[in-house]
Amino acid sequence: MIIVTGGAGMIGSAFVWKLNEMGIKDILIVDKLRKEDKWLNIRKREYYDWIDKDNLKEWLVCKENADNIEAVIHMGACSATTETDADFLMDNNFGYTKFLWNFCAEKNIKYIYASSAATYGMGELGYNDDVSPEELQKLMPLNKYGYSKKFFDDWAFKQKNQPKQWNGLKFFNVYGPQEYHKGRMASMVFHTYNQYKENGYVKLFKSYKEGFKDGEQLRDFVYVKDVVDIMYFMLVNDVKSGIYNIGTGKARSFMDLSMATMRAASHNDNLDKNEVVKLIEMPEDLQGRYQYFTEAKINKLREIGYTKEMHSLEEGVKDYVQNYLAKEDSYL
């Protein structure tokens, strides 16, 4: 059996979809559904059982349950970069992740967990995952969420007792189906699509940094279908333990993303950006701490044998918009 924590969240439920696509149904989903619409992410999925995250430790005490686990895919976390309760973040993102690490080490099974590109902070030291643990330890996250993720990464490298294989995944800007419950934390594709459908245009921030035109701030946008394909590759192959960037390796601008989204939504490749993009002032409190560039170095991912071409921004956005956002049933 495979445990997927955060299994009703965006990446977790998309990974359950991927497992189902590969014929795997012996899955334990671990999550909290609460009052939001996360339950819709798993409505079409086939899996063995679901358990509340607060009850997993007790469930694993039973030897019959624990001995039946082949791997743990830990996508469960508080992923809100705006969360202010550091104790909650450390308990949820560090303590729980550590508990699952120790379980996988004891059982000698694979452990794949969600780190984050937020650990890189402003990117002063670059976005390179293929460096020593000592170099990774120098990273300076900008928020408590990023710190909670970095703290576990640093802890992991110090452990003598390790899972059979462990992979910490630094996700960059993931977009795609299953993110509808995330509200403000949903991707720019989701928000751009809804802005365009409602207003006929989108708003983008002006630039306050030399070398970047208005709306041309850059991010590494990666489609969730590519993300879960990489995760599946790591699950079924023996790959080197460690930290891996999960991105496309090619930064694109918010202008590119917005135009790709609106062109896909309108089925019109000739939209003029001057007519559908409104540039607005960036709030003053953001101007000094706004990231203008992120781009994953993915050489390390390629070196372990993952050679598939990922969706281009235009390909991924078109699939997401036309086959999901525009449909009555927008779920995988």
UniProtKB/Swiss-Prot annotation:
Entry-linked InterPro entries: Epimerase_deHydtase, Heptose_epim, NAD(P)-bd_dom_sf
GO molecular function: ADP-glyceromanno-heptose 6-epimerase activity; NADP binding
Pathway(s) annotated for this protein in UniProt: Nucleotide-sugar biosynthesis; ADP-L-glycero-beta-D-manno-heptose biosynthesis; ADP-L-glycero-beta-D-manno-heptose from D-glycero-beta-D-manno-heptose 7-phosphate: step 4/4
Residues the record lists as binding NADP(+): 10-11, 31-32, 38, 53, 75-79, 92, 149, 174, 182
Active site, per annotation: 145, 182
Residues binding substrate, per UniProt: 173, 184, 191, 205-208, 219, 290
Cofactor field: NADP(+)
Regions that span the bilayer: none
Keywords: Carbohydrate metabolism, Isomerase, NADP
Cofactor note: Binds 1 NADP(+) per subunit.
Record EC number: 5.1.3.20
GO biological process: ADP-L-glycero-beta-D-manno-heptose biosynthetic process; carbohydrate metabolic process
Coiled coil: none
Catalyzed reaction equations: ADP-D-glycero-beta-D-manno-heptose = ADP-L-glycero-beta-D-manno-heptose
NCBIfam families for the chain: heptose_epim
Subunit structure as annotated in this protein's UniProt entry: Homopentamer.
HAMAP family assigned: Heptose_epimerase (MF_01601)
Domain statement: Contains a large N-terminal NADP-binding domain, and a smaller C-terminal substrate-binding domain.
Family: Belongs to the NAD(P)-dependent epimerase/dehydratase family. HldD subfamily.
Function: Catalyzes the interconversion between ADP-D-glycero-beta-D-manno-heptose and ADP-L-glycero-beta-D-manno-heptose via an epimerization at carbon 6 of the heptose.
Protein name: ADP-L-glycero-D-manno-heptose-6-epimerase
Species annotation: Fusobacterium nucleatum subsp. nucleatum (strain ATCC 25586 / DSM 15643 / BCRC 10681 / CIP 101130 / JCM 8532 / KCTC 2640 / LMG 13131 / VPI 4355)
